[in-house]
Amino acid sequence: MARKGNPISVRLDLNRSSDPSRFSDYYYGKSLYQDVNLRSYFSSIRPPTILTFGFRLGRCIILHFPKRTFIHFFLPRRPLRLKRRDKSRPGKDKGRWWAFGKVGPIGCLHSSEGTEEERNEVRGRGAGKRVESIDREKQNEIRIWPKKMQRYGYHDRSPSRKKNFSKSLRVSGAFKHPKYAGVVNDIAFLIENDGPTSHLLKRTLPAVRPSLNYSVMQYFFNTKNKMHFDPVVVLNHFVAPGVAEPSTMGGAKGGSLDKRIRSRIAFFVESSTSEKKCLARAKKRLIHFIRQANDLRFAGTTKTTISLFPFFGATFFFPRDGVGVYNNPFFEYAREQLLGQLRIKCRNLMGKDKVMELIEKFIYLGRIGKLIKGIEMMIEIILRKRIIPYGYNSYLNEVQKMRSFLSNRTNTNTLIESVKIKSVYQSASLIAQDISFQLGNNPISFRSIFSQIVKDIPLIMPKGVEGIRICCSGRLGGAEIARTECGKYGKTSCNVFNQKIDYALAEVSTRNGISGVKVRISYSQNKKGRAISETYEI
């Protein structure tokens, strides 16, 4: 009698030399909690809109293994509908599906003191994001929850907020980490620019606005340690000579510009240092301030001048790569000049010891190091130096924040890698998730799903794919008795140890119960076909 081979799930490199107790019920709750929190965090980073790409629930795949957790993001191609819309409207601004564009303001805290008009105002402008507070003694945080969690059934059960909001801030992102407490008093202050270069800024600086929101919310709820300074004076100190840009806000002069900056920040600081102010008034002014902050322009570029406005508590932002200015010697010289002026002015204002402490703090937080090197647009998750749209940099910046946050909070080495999928058959997990989505949303039979998947396999077989095997178990089609249906195309040998196989498992909750999907893809030994799991160094 022939000996039965080990299951393919055990022969995978990811699951070898692992503790069997890892798959017991003891760790199930921990894995479920981790998965739900990761998905809610991803969806809160950037909700999708009609013309902008965002993290949508179900568009990321999280694979938990005994020693690693893989997170797969799948970025589709630009829809044909948008291409036709751009051609039909030559005079309109063309929306780019991969660009993050303008980030909506963070919705303010809902309370009983607020009027119905203010609540409708928040819902209209803050669509997609909602701030819910959690009044806990041990957690001095606020979490940005997605407005709606589909497919999972996890509703927003966070308690309603209390009057004392000094205990109730939780901002989604890397600012949760305790190492950012040293810069909690720093405030972002910027100048509005509505000049002819605003269209360039929308393409080159899409990742700045989320950081401004985090910084504003972070400073607003700090009521213990206050930092008294004049934002306008500090701004004038830190802008390099000859690098300033004239005001373009409707012909406003420098004095009126200073007054606008002061008026925007005056009530902002007063509300943050007093807990006895009217909560409804503070909420209304905060919403107005955040909306104005979302419309600010963070840098302006012309043929002869450059305007760089650094601020504490966030990253130093400069023109992005992809528009032909990143390697310009003039920009490099202006960046070094700004850094030199920053050190000189800091030394004159605070003294050498304080300056060195501040510089070390920024180096520890990754600020000055990035400034000296030039802002790193492509972090190590892009390994093959592919040409991608520069709007994609926003996604990379958010992933970098997410990676550092997960690494610091879990004390593990977190690697989030971006892999370009040339074919859907490169990932068994993608096919398994796609089948589970179809079974959960549409009453479609397994045979029709299988026929749609395998119809393009003959076209990609010369590229390294030998075959595919798909099994689906459960009450398929509403049957009273659960059964298993399998489909096979090509060669799918599961009894050879040196066979290159990608395996994935997915579950979906339907009205008839839970159904499971297993996908195995076999790759040729001679060709260069490989799965996503093989792109990681395991």
UniProtKB/Swiss-Prot annotation:
Residues 120-134 have a biased composition (Basic and acidic residues). Pfam families: Ribosomal_S3_C. One of its GO terms (biological process) is translation. Transmembrane segments: none annotated. Residues 111-134 are annotated as: Disordered. It comes from the Eukaryota. Keywords: Mitochondrion, Ribonucleoprotein, Ribosomal protein. InterPro entries: KH_sf_prok-type, Ribosomal_S3_C_sf, Ribosomal_uS3_C, Ribosomal_uS3_CS, Ribosomal_uS3m_plant. Its main location: mitochondrion. GO terms for molecular function: RNA binding; structural constituent of ribosome. GO terms for cellular component: mitochondrion; ribonucleoprotein complex; ribosome. It is found in: Mitochondrion. Belongs to the universal ribosomal protein uS3 family. This is Small ribosomal subunit protein uS3m. The gene is RPS3.
